[in-house]
Every structure is written in C-alpha cells, then in structure tokens.
Amino acid sequence: RYLLKPLVALFDKLIFSKVRENFGGELKFFIGGGALLDKNLQKFYVGIGIPMFQGYGLSEATPVISSNGPELYRFGSSGKLVKPIELKICDSEGKELPVGEQGEIVVKGENVMAGYWKNPESTAETVKDGYLYTGDLGYMSKEGLLYVKGRFKSLLISSDGEKYSPEGIEEALVE
C-alpha cells in the first residue's frame, strides 16, 4: 500500500489533474441519473478525484427521489431519500414488502404529480391514494439506501415463477 502512494501521486500530477482541469478545476463531485450508472465508471471518477454519484428521480415525481452524496455513497445504490418523500417497495398486488426485498418502487410526496394531462385512465393506473407506482424495480437496504434494479413492468418470469429483470440479464452478459 505504501508503494502505491508515490505512483498515485505521479498519476495525479501527470494525468488526473489534467482531467480535473478539463472540468474547470473546481468540480468537487457530480450526480448522474436517467439510467443506472456503470459502477466501473463511478470508480474511475472517484479515482481521479471527482466522485460521480448516482441519483434517482422521474418526471412524474420531479426532480429527485434519492441521491448519493459526498457524506454517504455506495456504488450501485441510488442513495438516501430526499425529505419529505415517502417510499415503499410493493409486490405485484400492491402489498408493501419488507426491507431488502425487491419489488416496485412506490413514492408519495409533494413532488408527485396530480395526474397525466387529460388521461384519467393512465392516472388511475399509476397514482393510487396519492402514491405513484413508478414501474421501476428496486429495494431498500437496511442502511436506508435505495437500489434501483430496472423496470418492474418488464420482468421476465421463469418456469418456476422466479422474476428476472432484463437489465440484470444484460449486465451479466456484458460482464
């Protein structure tokens, strides 16, 4: 470990400092979303001194549901919930699941839309008792971090009833 310090310092001086300079030299961290961020890409940015944190949000509950930040982050996680959002994870019947179990991400808060413009049918399917059923698959960890795993509505069901996310299969194939 002690032998790595001089190498890291050398790489920082020759390479990483120039990358940071291309970002203006003042960037402390940045947050990405819109799709799941690649863990290796996140690790690269942490390594060069500009951490890339993953967040989660959607148009129907704008702008942010959860985010990692400098004080707490885990690769692969979408971070802690922003206040005052309520979040629960539900099964396909809408029953709340315990911490650690995967299901549909369901949110409630002042940021949740009232409904879709001139589309009461879609609104009734998506917003129930003030809760927005996002259609996204995820779980909450014991630490209170949200993990988004893919789309709940596009799950593949095996012959034994096990549910698989296409994104998880794609990730396994890429690795």
Language-model regions: role of each:
Residues 17, 76, 121, 171:
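Active-site phosphate/pyrophosphate- and oxyanion-stabilizing loops and adjacent acidic/basic residues
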Residues 22, 33, 44, 48-51, ...:
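Generic, well-ordered alpha-helical scaffold segments in large soluble proteins
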Residues 167-175:
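Repeat-solenoid scaffold signature
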Residues 158-160, 166-167:
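Glycine-enriched catalytic-core subsegment of oxygenase/oxidase enzymes
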Residues 81, 88-90, 95-100, 106-158:
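Conserved ATP-binding/catalytic segment of the ANL
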Residues 1-73, 86:
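Gly/Ser/Thr-rich phosphate-binding loop
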Residues 34, 113, 166:
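Glycine-rich phosphate/pyrophosphate-binding beta-alpha loops
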